[in-house]
Amino acid sequence: MINSIIINNIEGEYVPKDAFFQDWLKAVDYKKNSEITIKIVTEDEMRGFNKLYKGEDKISDTLAFPYEKLNLDNKIILGDIAMCAKKINNDALVYKKNKIDRWAHLTIHSVLHILGYLHDNEANQKIMEKREMDILRKFDILNPYEI
């Protein structure tokens, strides 16, 4: 099971309650005792992460940083996820999606990246999207790729 540490110092933006993140991570159904840190960031922080780690001057909704090391309690530290609250909330409006559904999708999408799923080609994209939909259906969330 994946446990999460949520770090949120953002004010004035909608961010789901920690319990939602826990539910989404539980639905991934990862069997090993593990942990992911989710940090809610500002647009400036996300732009900085993109410049530093991807060489791109842009704001993305999420970035996933796989790690996979054991801590002292023999819990696997899978990695970190940065989530830009303002970008996620704005995109929910642009794409006419429910905010909580958008957060669920992007959290699950990011966790799957940390677990090794990719969308670097059509075959991998289909595999990843199917896995996302299998999880999102547990929450009655419609296909996020249909606009």
Predicted regions and their residues:
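An acidic/histidine-cluster motif and surrounding catalytic segment
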Residues: M1-A104, I114-I147
